[in-house]
Amino acid sequence: MKIVCVGDAYITDVMMRDGLRPFLGKDDSVTIFFFGDPDQTVMRDMAKFIEAGGREEIEVPDGLFEAVADADLLIVHLCPVTRRLIEAAPKLKAIMSCRGGLENIDVQAATEHNVIVSNNPAHNANAVAEFTIGLILAETRNICRSNYALKNGEWRKTYPNTATTIKEMTDMTVGIVGYGSIGRLVAYKLSVFGCRILVADPFLKEC
């Protein structure tokens, strides 16, 4: 199998090579490119541009079109995979994305050419779940409001939720819409606080 990888400032070429090494057979070959700028700040702006629909306007690494001509598998992170690139790879069987979103990949073109596209939706799921818990605590305990008031010399005593007793987490019922990788982690973390959890997910018969 011929594998072509395109790393970047976030998922580097070294990371890709090290990650693939345990799974390679003796007949597998790997060609690795580096996409974009080594500065993550620059790449963050480029990612936003790609996600906003600018996929076709970004140049891919030199030599990538030639490399995919006989490739079986293409692995990318932020590098755009356009219709033109897919059509230059007649033997391509699958495109794997190291990120959750697929905005940088022309999924429709891949589908038309019978190329499987897979992503990694759980790669930052725990970070998102932790951030969600943080927001719940900040909102219910008025942490941000208190901080803002103190910075402005005010000792605030009332908040939007002080009309009734402010509930502790253990007394809360929390509804979660969507029970995928992130939803499950949020539910688990909330259960440690003692919350009652209600879940709604149209894709699951029973949660």
Model-flagged regions — what are they?
Residues 14, 83-87, 130, 144, ...:
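Alpha-helical elements of the RecA-like P-loop NTPase motor core of helicases
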Residues 162-207:
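Rossmann-like dinucleotide/phosphate-binding beta-alpha-beta segment
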Residues 100, 122, 180-184:
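Glycine-rich NAD(P) Rossmann-fold beta1-alpha1 loop
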Residues 83, 125-126, 205:
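Positions that flank functional sites
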Residues 113, 121-173, 185-188:
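Phosphate-binding beta-alpha-beta segment of Rossmann-like dinucleotide-binding domains, i.e.
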Residues 13, 40, 104-105, 127, ...:
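Generic structural signal for helix capping and beta-alpha/helix-loop junctions
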Residues 1-116:
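An N-terminal-biased, well-structured beta-alpha scaffold segment characteristic
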